[in-house]
UniProtKB/Swiss-Prot annotation:
Name of the protein this chain belongs to: Thymidine kinase
GO biological process: DNA biosynthetic process; thymidine metabolic process
Enzyme Commission designation: 2.7.1.21
Entry annotation: catalytic residues: E89 (proton acceptor)
Description of how the protein assembles with itself and partners: Homotetramer.
A GO CC annotation given for this chain: cytosol
Gene: tdk
Family of this protein: Belongs to the thymidine kinase family.
Record organism: Streptococcus mutans serotype c (strain ATCC 700610 / UA159)
Pfam families: TK
Amino acid sequence: MTVLAQLYYKYGTMNSGKTIEILKVAHNYEEQGKPVVIMTSSLDTRDGFGVVASRIGMRREAVTITDDMDIFAYIENMFKKPYCILIDESQFLSQKNVYDLARIVDELDVPVMAFGLKNDFQNHLFEGSRELLLLADKIEEIKTICQFCSKKATMVLRTENGRPVYKGNQIQIGGNETYIPVCRRHYFHPPIKA
């Protein structure tokens, strides 16, 4: 029986270890002599353009994805087909980008693992997340705990000057200084001043 490639969507809140997982998977493939392609959204420039970096200091160069990039053609035209494609910040992908990833799996038989946030600070799905939830063959939650208690964090609280923010642009690039992983209770009632 032939094992066919699949599209995986692994989501979690901020600080759940998504990027560490990407770097670990890449290392495991490459230790076996199997090349991978790491890609990330061009919107995330926290650690530099075309860089995937974890909060614990691990980092790798990555191919940047723009909304109009033809990811399918990029992979199809590579001299050596990768064994796996790893996507960071997949919430920022466009519908076209996600459809390209599905085509890579279905037509090129290359597995794709997309990692990202599911919902924004207002609890709305990102475009990339919505499309991945619709098209992924396997969906997995990467869990972390609420910053204020021991419950599972399922939401992201945006803060500004130490205060919760519930309105504003969907995309505002930031890290631990801006976004906090929280449970539902502490999203609606954070133990910080509003």
